[in-house]
Curated annotation (Swiss-Prot):
Domain of life: Eukaryota
Domain 2Fe-2S ferredoxin-type residue range list: 3-32
Gene Ontology CC: one annotated term: chloroplast
Keywords: 2Fe-2S, Chloroplast, Electron transport, Iron, Iron-sulfur, Metal-binding, Plastid, Transport
Gene source species: Porphyridium purpureum
GO MF, any single term: 2 iron, 2 sulfur cluster binding
Major localization listed first in the record, in broad terms: plastid
Family, similarity comment: Belongs to the 2Fe2S plant-type ferredoxin family.
Cofactor binding note: Binds 1 [2Fe-2S] cluster.
The protein's name: Ferredoxin
Function: Ferredoxins are iron-sulfur proteins that transfer electrons in a wide variety of metabolic reactions.
Length: 32
């Protein structure tokens, strides 16, 4: 399965949606 993960930080001005496979650590996916 693949999940869409939204990273939101109003203070940092970040609003990113990433695709994350269920066998990948979210921190590893966020680095890519």
């Amino acid at each position: 399965a693949t999940y869409k993960v939204r990273l939101l930080s109003e203070a940092e001005g970040i609003d990113v949606t990433i695709d994350c496979a269920d066998d990948v650590y979210i921190l590893d996916a966020a680095e890519e």
